[in-house]
Amino acid sequence: MPRVALQMSFRPDRPNRSTTIHWSFAVSRPESLRTLLLRLPPGMGFANSSLGIEECAPAVLEAAGPEGCPADSRLGHGSAVAQVPAQSLVSERAQVTALLGPSAGGDGETMNVLFFVEGRSPVNREIVLDGQLSGIGAAGGATLMTEAPPLPVWPAGPDIGLVRFRSTIGPEGLTYYRRVGGRRVAFEPRGLSVPRRCPRGGFPVSLTLGWWAVSGTVTARGRVACPRG
């Protein structure tokens, strides 16, 4: 089975204050990703977040990229590395943009999250991954679930295998806009808030990955360090 390593941090990391979640994972060997389930720490605050004021339609994202979507739909950004099977493994680097997708319902506990993955060399490809951030406010913590299709290098060819992925969820590097007195004014949105209390050893997090060609799943567990002071 592939080995998976998970890392997560809050920046800044003050209790009950807006933060940006930085999360990343690495896989020991290239495999075609099928499912991703990220569990956030219990107690993350969503009530005061202003992330995702507007929605981005998947059809618009596929046709025009993130630039075709409202700036106020962006949730985060990052990068990915995949490996392309050839005579030897060839690394493919890609940019990642996370955006708010169409509403998943009126319960207020689920958000659709779209990941736009843009690779340029050696394979020129753009992929939209559809995910759901659910269980917002749940005692056990919210979860981010994403599914990915097989990604062959060419028709009937071998699949691209994801080996590294990192992304943010939060205001770091984001600029939103609003109308004030008829003028368009830029502002930084509020992110999710760091839990008020930190358990001994840090906030528990986990990541479960599944692959198309591998039976079963692998779960990586970690801890986010408690805020200082």
Where does each model-flagged region fall?
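Ser/Thr/Pro/Gly-rich, low-complexity intrinsically disordered stalk/linker tracts of secreted
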Residues: 1-229
